[in-house]
Amino acid sequence: MPLSLDQRSLQAPWRIVDELIEQPSWGGRYIIDLKGLGSSEQWSGKKVGQSYELSRKAKLFNPADDSKVTLADLIASDPAAVLGAPVLTKFGADISLLIKLTQAKGNSFQVHLPEGKTLGHWEPKPEAWFYLAPGLFTFGIKLDKSFTDFSNALHKIDDCMRRLSDEVKGGQLSLDEAKQKTQELIASVDPYQYVNVVVAEADQIIDLTAGGIHHSWEEDNERFPDGNLVYEVQVDVPDERCSMRGFDKGKFLPDGSLRPTHVADYLATIEQDAEHNELSRHISKPQLLSEQNGAKVESLFRTPYFNLDRISIEAGAEYRDDASGGFHHLFIHAGNAQLGDTKLAQGQSYLIPAATGIYNIAATEKAAIFKTYLPV
């Protein structure tokens, strides 16, 4: 039976309940500290790699009356009031939007299927990143390098790792020996010579929504001890249905086994044209939309799947917006603000239902807010 909510609740700024993902190996303290949880016993001595700021399974909290509800139940209570009629018409009631705050070291060489293409069970996963601080990543392949040589290098590493994994599990080889042999092979074939290695700048936008583009986060503890600090927006698709790993960087699990790799599918999916691999086509900086009365709005992402703006408000200033055309998701990246009777706290996310209509945010201190919404 659908949840029954009054009009006041449908107009409330609903806070997204924190969902932090512990990652002892590649996470850090950035997300914990940003959310004001640094002194929490629950997170003492722990590292977090991601927080889900919005997902299909999100739970929401109404600060006005302490009520709680799942996102699915809130939408089901009145889809048009929550999402907005234009959003409902174009995207339907199942909002497959995933917003993550990430602190990550290196991950595997990956690719996602482009829209309109089919390959086995794989599905597209349009995504975009906004770098909050300098970092390191790879993006696209080098068009002046042999793709055949790249393919041979990845297959050679993958075949070797599978053989070494079997030997470790069979007791013929120690895990340390297998790791050493793998790193020696990786150094000799050097898969990085075939991809673009990019030093990320703060406020850099990486648009991967086209699909078919090789990408990875990279690790350099001397230059970037915090890893990659990224605000991600993507279509919500489980990794096992969208992320093809071409190279897992020589990583073994403690028992000598391997994470799944999909070298043939990865290579078959990579687009080899300039449109997909020229960095200038996909990497950009914020674009100013408006600036008045102490409030500045910049465009970050403009895609067919989602849009993202950054709103910067000076202390004591106000920002006015209108959600009637479709819901807004707000993440308070810095500072604190006020929306009606609700405090918008740093490190927290809020859902503004379409029924809210026009709303005003007053910055009690200098604030930076990310606003995600759907293009209608």
Describe each region flagged by the PLM.
Residues L98-K100, N107, G120-H121, E127-F130, ...:
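His/acidic/aromatic-lined binding-pocket segments of jelly-roll/cupin-type domains
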Residues M1-S174, P238-D239, G246-R281, L308, ...:
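Transition-metal
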Residues Q172-V189, A323-F331:
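Short, basic/aromatic beta-hairpin or loop at an interaction surface
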Residues K179-C242:
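Loop-centered beta-sheet repeat module
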Residues T102-G106, P114-E115, E123-P124, A133-L136, ...:
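Ligand-binding loop in jelly-roll beta-barrel domains
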Residues T261-G325:
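Functionally critical, mid-to-C-terminal surface segments that flank or help form catalytic/ligand
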Residues V195-D207, Q338-N360:
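Short acidic-glycine-tyrosine-enriched beta hairpin
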Residues N107, V111-E115, A133, P304-A323, ...:
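Conserved short histidine dyad/triad with adjacent acidic residue
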